[in-house]
């Protein structure tokens, strides 16, 4: 049994982690908003946690972050929460004698890269990705034989009642029973089911690992595959029409961001993703749970 301190216990992934492992590990969480978990401490600011709050724990998992929020256009705010606060919490954990600090990061540190491997340069293109990369680098610099930093960079997560922006849009489109333009989509994108992600995080704590990790589902999917899986889960028939090349070129020119998300590739090297700490993820399931409408 591990003694685990979770920061950001009111986040979705943290809640999934707590529910799965509350009976097998000793978990205490600090949250900004109450969730009803018995061993929860609600605070106004995580940065104000005293060093003593970290004492006696084997590992700290930091889920606290500002993620992609279009209304926030201030790099300083992202840096303050995702970078400086994360490093401050890690410093306090190290001072208190905690052996491992697990930082939830993101593949957004690679910007628009379509293939991610050990040699892919880190070139974030958003405030979110930039702030996370700054934290990742400083936390790794803090890592030593007494204090291990583990950086987890997952792709888009889904499942457990959660469907992020673009996936939720696809679910709603499928629910409308209209033809969709993905019949010729042969792209490859990595995703991770929330169950796979929390199991990977727990395995990282259990094995006391350090370094940078890229957990994913077992195989990548094309947008066409995703639509077919959504249709199967919802029990509906969806017509996927092939898209003329002139249409795709127009979308790529006018909305390159949309083209990348729907027809572009985001694939993590399989050896990098799957063999790091012996995890054995399953394939895409439960994508549409509680996400229709």
What is each stretch, according to the model?
Residues 123-150:
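Active-site Tyr-X1-5-Lys
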Residues 200-258, 291-292:
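Mid/C-terminal beta-alpha module of Rossmann-like enzyme folds, strongest
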Residues 110-111, 152-168:
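Flexible, glycine-rich beta-alpha linker
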Residues 87-127, 150:
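Conserved Rossmann-fold NAD(P)-dependent oxidoreductase catalytic core, especially the SDR/UDP-sugar
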Residues 46-84, 88, 92, 112:
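NAD(P)H-binding glycine-rich loop region in Rossmannoid oxidoreductase-like domains
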Residues 162-169, 182-205, 211-214:
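Substrate-positioning beta->alpha
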Residues 4-23:
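N-terminal Rossmann NAD(P)H-binding glycine-rich loop of SDR-like oxidoreductase domains
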Residues 221, 229, 239, 258-293:
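C-terminal amphipathic/interface module of NAD(P)-dependent oxidoreductases
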């Amino acid at each position: 049994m591990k003694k685990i301190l979770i920061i950001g216990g009111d986040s979705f992934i943290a809640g999934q982690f707590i529910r799965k492992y509350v009976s097998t590990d000793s978990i205490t969480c600090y949250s900004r908003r109450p969730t009803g978990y018995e061993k929860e401490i609600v605070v106004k600011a995580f940065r104000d946690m005293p060093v003593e709050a970290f004492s006696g724990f084997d590992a700290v998992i930091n889920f606290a972050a500002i993620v992609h929020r279009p209304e926030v256009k201030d790099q300083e705010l992202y840096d303050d929460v995702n970078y400086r606060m994360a490093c401050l919490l890690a410093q306090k954990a190290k001072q208190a004698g905690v052996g491992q600090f697990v930082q939830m990061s993101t593949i957004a540190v690679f910007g628009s890269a379509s293939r991610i491997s050990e040699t892919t340069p880190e070139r974030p293109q958003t405030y979110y990705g930039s702030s996370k990369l700054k934290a990742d680098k400083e936390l790794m610099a803090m890592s030593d034989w007494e204090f291990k930093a583990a950086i987890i960079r997952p792709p888009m997560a889904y499942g457990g009642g959660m469907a992020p922006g673009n996936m939720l849009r696809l679910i709603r489109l499928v629910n409308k029973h209209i033809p969709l333009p993905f019949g010729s989509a042969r792209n490859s994108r990595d995703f991770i089911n929330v169950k796979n992600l929390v199991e990977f995080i727990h395995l990282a704590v259990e094995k006391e690992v350090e370094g940078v990790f890229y957990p994913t589902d077992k195989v990548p999917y094309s947008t066409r595959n995703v639509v077919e899986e959504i249709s199967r889960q919802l029990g509906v028939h969806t017509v996927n029409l092939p898209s003329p090349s002139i249409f795709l070129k127009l979308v790529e020119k006018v909305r390159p961001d949309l083209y990348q998300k729907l027809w572009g590739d985001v694939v993590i090297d399989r050896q990098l993703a799957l063999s790091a700490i012996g995890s054995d993820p399953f394939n895409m399931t439960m994508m549409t749970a509680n996400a229709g409408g």
